[in-house]
């Protein structure tokens, strides 16, 4: 496209207002779109792509073997890249400005036409949120004030169907399936993870070489691409074609149903007063997370989101530890039906991994460090993490606990969660080693969250997480009267007898047995205080924080600073929290579209893990939210430079409410009620207010308060 010009169209006032409100990220006045590395994306949790990128990704579609021996010609399991049929270029147009509309989940480019001054062209991309199987592009040409016709030159760039590294592509165009207005392809991966050969049928509008708009006319052209996999149905080819035909006939109506669906998502969110940049970071982080997952497609969440092949598109502990908690407060159904259900669906793979350690006699569910389509281990064999980083199995158990404590969803816990929990406990019972002399249990030869430490013994994070896992499983068994069907005494003995390293003299936790001040990669011991909420004195919490801040590398991921922020706020040291807080979201400031990188200098792009950590710093740090059995705690504080914060439509035990605060007042507002329970607010100012009306409750800023529930009998 033509890009050189001395004068540029200016975005309209409404556009600038949306930028200021934090709902739109924009480039204008000669700024050019960033390279693909820092470019934004559109997605709906089923399908996604980077604008201008060569590949489209469908969740759950991977190419490459589970076991990879490091052969450069034998790519490991990774997201399979579908050619980007939506990558349409208008070659005779001049780029003017563009923006990601976060609220509407659309990306818009605006052009002028040098040969037709006054003609305005808009190119709008979106992944339809309601109809998950389609991508839509609109090219709208406003030639209404021009006295001559205008012709746009179109082409699809970057398409090479014969040299695709991930798929064998069969062109079914001009067969009995299709006509001249659209094209149909059957894409089959080249190498399966194990046995199943995933195929994707793609039906896409044929892109003309040119389109002409008559003088005085304003016209919109639609280009639709539909996807359907043999994961969903055996009739995926005919199904893709049917979806395409149906939606293309309704093309003018697609944008409305897309926006309506995103309006439902944004019922819950976070509002920031006084800092428009921070509001942009918050909204864009939520957008990138929400556009990567959906509740009717349970294929996990990768550190690089759905629009990239970062980390091969695999799911790690990042899902449960970093991304899940902020999503949980806003949309617990999404957590249950996508993130947790992904783990439940893949229990056979977790069992297979446990049994693969034949000389160790492991059993139960040992979740893989890297998981893709089947749930078996897909970490490349040259990386020790796939063998030794095992805390993920405890992390998943504690994520189930978070979900249950927040929702009280006992039916799901009984029907789905409990089976996973029992298998997790069985694994750890087979994994621990008993020291008869000291009558203690150890977990040896492990990699903790600090991945610089390889093959260490008694990682304090791992052991505390495992201890809590056993306590949680026993709690559930007691709740549902199933204690006679588990080895209650043995599991209790392990929970009480695990080695938990602690220096009584200096009141701090060594990271692992023999730790002696080595540099660490990222937050590890600090995670004992949050998210694990392990019982310790304030002195120990502070000592851990001071010690490990000093030995953490400056080139690690941003989540470290989020957790340090949470810790300092918990210790009521606002000044120290502020220093860490600004570092926690520095990794997205290199892109006009606030695309995160893993570290300050680069690494994985569209780093959803960092977004999740950042949002935790806001919600669990400055919101002071803590999820306990039977209650929620709050201790609202304000980040430097802001005038107010609000968590909108937070979910708890089937009810929803707003919690907002400024420099003088905390406002609590009920929105919807679960008729089966009643909520009560307890604070130093109010004693047990039953929350049975929509009338707001006002507390003095600086107050701590608690929401707890009782069943209506």
From Swiss-Prot:
User: Which EC number applies?
Assistant: 3.2.1.107
Family per record = Belongs to the glycosyl hydrolase 65 family.
* The UniProt record lists the keyword Hydrolase: yes
Q: Which range is the signal sequence, renumbered to this chain? A: 1-21
| Record keywords | Glycoprotein, Glycosidase, Hydrolase, Secreted, Signal
Q: Does the keyword GTP-binding apply?
A: no
Protein's recorded name: Protein-glucosylgalactosylhydroxylysine glucosidase
Q: Where in the cell is it found?
A: Secreted
Catalytic residue positions: 451 (proton donor)
One GO cellular component, as annotated: extracellular region
Q: Where does substrate bind?
A: 317-318, 521-522
Question: Per its database record, what is this protein's job?
Answer: Catalyzes the hydrolysis of glucose from the disaccharide unit linked to hydroxylysine residues of collagen and collagen-like proteins.
One GO-annotated biological process of the protein: carbohydrate metabolic process
What InterPro entries does the database record attribute to this sequence?
Answer: 6-hairpin_glycosidase_sf, 6hp_glycosidase-like_sf, Glyco_hydro_65_C, Glyco_hydro_65_M
Q: Reaction(s) catalyzed by this protein?
A: (5R)-5-O-[alpha-D-glucosyl-(1->2)-beta-D-galactosyl]-5-hydroxy-L-lysyl-[collagen] + H2O = (5R)-5-O-(beta-D-galactosyl)-5-hydroxy-L-lysyl-[collagen] + D-glucose
